[in-house]
């Protein structure tokens, strides 16, 4: 089995790469995916988003090592094991990131990945329904929409932000990210619009793309060049030969794992695992970053939340309505309002993100209280804490060792304490007077720094945005794994393109920038001149130097 290009992983970036490499019909492409079909309502119905993330059938099901700053809890670290990868099991939220994120990438050595460079790729990939004119793409593969925003709690949240003195934004993926506004979703005609639906399935219809269901064991390297991928399929070990290049797009956990199993990584660690060193790249597995969040929950004194729909019977009614019409509550992820805020004066960009939900539920999907309620998922998104991914053994079937080192930087604690107090201020605004009941979580008695810290240690969870473990940078940077054209330094014919190459975590959910990475990487692989740089200047808050709002 062979093709011009072999891609490991059918996720956000891998699907986009397959689509672009196969576009003109010149090249053959094989996409290797360990997971199975994405068919069925658990994945395709937006409101069912909590299900695939908790199902072993669709998810690698990783756990972190005990996190010392979080009461030694092992934190859930899901990654998609299904066609479409994590874009098939995520929360369907679409955020490009802030302009400063990508300018920071370039400062860290990713030349050609500044905001002016990547904005044209965001436009190329988007089919935006209702975004800011001139800033959004309108004919790309990825449909992006807003929800119906029919619940009054969404409007109360946005009004509360304005009453607290914060900015409003008509399109946070346009010129102005900062402020309260409506959240965008990767949903089209009532269905999840994953990378599989947007990119991979259309590419498979061309006849020069083949999807292979198999488990990648290692990249085969001969004389310093990647020549194929060793996989397990139907109980046998096989080789998939790459006539031109191998592209690894296997996630921020599995991309470094596969490189290390192939002999690319920190030499001392590889030797400890009994793996022959092909390229000593100490940055493989290092620089792990993520977003954390907690749920701030409040009782609603009016019966307007989604609490009535939580019993199994009514969930079944919503599911049946979606199956028949692709409409109703099932056609939205229910994240329809949001905010992007700065925690302090002097910041160039927002660093706190809110997802607002018109129901109070726990991580397992059960009601947080026996009453109507609402909640905000609150996260500080520019943490300085760093972790790593290493091998557990040389056995490809062993899970990687994931150490996030969450909350290991003192600033993280300061910022998250601020998040708790800021959310109380927002929920305390006049707009919520008709809805606000008792505080469920953290609880009205949680006030001091010590009490808030104890709450955070017990309740902080991952927002499932890992990145950075195969960092992109200058070829002379010893910690860089790939150069700005996504080529693995020290090995010919091998690239990595997914969220693992991000030099720094972006501000927001990672599906959007991961797809953009695949789009831009495809041009590099094909040797195309990058799209012309944009000269559009994003909005800058004129009060940023003196105010946090």
Swiss-Prot record:
What protein name applies here? Answer: Oxygen-dependent choline dehydrogenase
Catalytic site: 465 (proton acceptor)
Q: Could you tell me the EC number(s) of this protein? A: 1.1.99.1, 1.2.1.8
Cofactor(s) named in the record: FAD
Q: Where is this region: Disordered?
A: 528-549
What is the top EC class of this enzyme, as a single word? oxidoreductase
Residues annotated for FAD binding in this entry: 4-33
The processes (GO biological process) annotated in the record are: glycine betaine biosynthetic process from choline
Q: What does the record give as its pathway?
A: Amine and polyamine biosynthesis; betaine biosynthesis via choline pathway; betaine aldehyde from choline (cytochrome c reductase route): step 1/1
| Primary role | Involved in the biosynthesis of the osmoprotectant glycine betaine. Catalyzes the oxidation of choline to betaine aldehyde and betaine aldehyde to glycine betaine at the same rate.
Catalysed reaction per UniProt? choline + A = betaine aldehyde + AH2; betaine aldehyde + NAD(+) + H2O = glycine betaine + NADH + 2 H(+)
The entry's keywords: FAD, Flavoprotein, NAD, Oxidoreductase
Q: Which family does it belong to?
A: Belongs to the GMC oxidoreductase family.
Pfam families, A to Z: GMC_oxred_C, GMC_oxred_N
Q: Which HAMAP family match?
A: Choline_dehydrogen (MF_00750)
**Which domain of life does the UniProt lineage start with?**
Bacteria
Cite a single GO MF annotation.
Answer: choline dehydrogenase activity
What gene is it encoded by?
betA
């Amino acid at each position: 089995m062979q093709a011009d290009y072999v891609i490991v992983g059918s996720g956000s970036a891998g699907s986009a790469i397959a689509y672009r490499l196969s576009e003109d019909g010149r090249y053959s492409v094989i996409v290797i995916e360990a997971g199975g079909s994405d068919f069925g309502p658990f994945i395709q119905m937006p409101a069912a988003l909590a299900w695939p993330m908790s199902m072993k059938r669709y998810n690698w099901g990783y756990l972190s090592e005990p996190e010392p700053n979080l009461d030694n809890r092992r934190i859930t670290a899901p990654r998609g094991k299904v066609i479409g990868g994590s874009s098939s099991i995520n929360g369907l939220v679409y955020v490009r990131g802030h302009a400063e994120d990508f300018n920071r990438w370039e400062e860290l050595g990713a030349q050609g990945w500044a905001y002016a460079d990547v904005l044209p790729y965001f436009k190329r990939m988007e089919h935006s329904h209702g975004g800011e004119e001139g800033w959004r793409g309108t004919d790309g593969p990825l449909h992006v929409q807003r929800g119906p925003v029919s619940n009054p709690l969404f409007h109360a949240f946005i009004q509360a932000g304005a009453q607290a003195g914060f900015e409003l934004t008509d399109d946070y993926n346009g010129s102005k990210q900062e402020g309260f506004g409506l959240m965008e979703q990767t949903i089209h005609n009532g269905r999840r619009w994953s990378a599989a639906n947007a990119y991979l399935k259309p590419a498979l219809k061309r006849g020069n793309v083949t999807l292979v269901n198999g488990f990648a064991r290692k990249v085969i390297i001969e004389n310093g060049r990647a020549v194929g991928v060793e996989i397990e399929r139907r109980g046998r070990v096989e080789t998939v030969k790459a006539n031109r290049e191998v592209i690894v797009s296997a996630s921020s956990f599995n991309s470094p794992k596969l490189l290390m199993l192939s002999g690319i990584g920190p030499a001392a660690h590889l030797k400890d695992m009994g793996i022959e060193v092909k390229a000593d790249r100490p940055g493989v597995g290092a620089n792990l970053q993520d977003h954390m969040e907690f749920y701030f929950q409040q009782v609603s004194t009016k019966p307007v939340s989604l609490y009535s729909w939580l019993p199994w019977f009514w969930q079944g009614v919503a599911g049946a309505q979606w199956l028949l019409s692709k409409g109703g509550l099932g056609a939205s992820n229910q994240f329809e309002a949001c905010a992007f805020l700065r925690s302090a004066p002097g910041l160039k960009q927002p660093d706190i993100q809110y997802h607002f939900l018109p129901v109070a539920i726990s991580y397992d999907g059960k009601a947080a209280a026996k009453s109507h309620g609402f909640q905000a998922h609150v996260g500080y998104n520019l943490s300085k804490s760093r972790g790593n991914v290493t091998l557990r053994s040389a056995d490809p079937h062993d899970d990687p060792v994931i150490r996030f080192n969450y909350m290991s930087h003192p600033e993280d604690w300061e910022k998250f304490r601020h998040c708790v107090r800021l959310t109380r201020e927002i929920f305390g605004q006049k707009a919520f007077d008709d809805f606000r009941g008792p505080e469920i979580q953290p609880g009205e008695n949680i006030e001091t720094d010590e009490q808030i810290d104890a709450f955070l240690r017990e309740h902080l969870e991952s927002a499932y945005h890992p990145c950075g473990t195969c960092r992109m940078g200058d070829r002379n940077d010893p910690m860089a794994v790939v150069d700005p054209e996504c080529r693995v330094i020290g090995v010919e014919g091998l690239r990595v393109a997914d969220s693992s190459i991000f030099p720094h975590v972006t501000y927001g959910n990672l599906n959007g920038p991961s797809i953009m990475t695949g789009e831009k990487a495809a041009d590099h692989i094909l040797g195309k001149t990058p799209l012309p740089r944009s000269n559009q200047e994003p909005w800058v808050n004129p009060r940023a130097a003196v105010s946090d709002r």
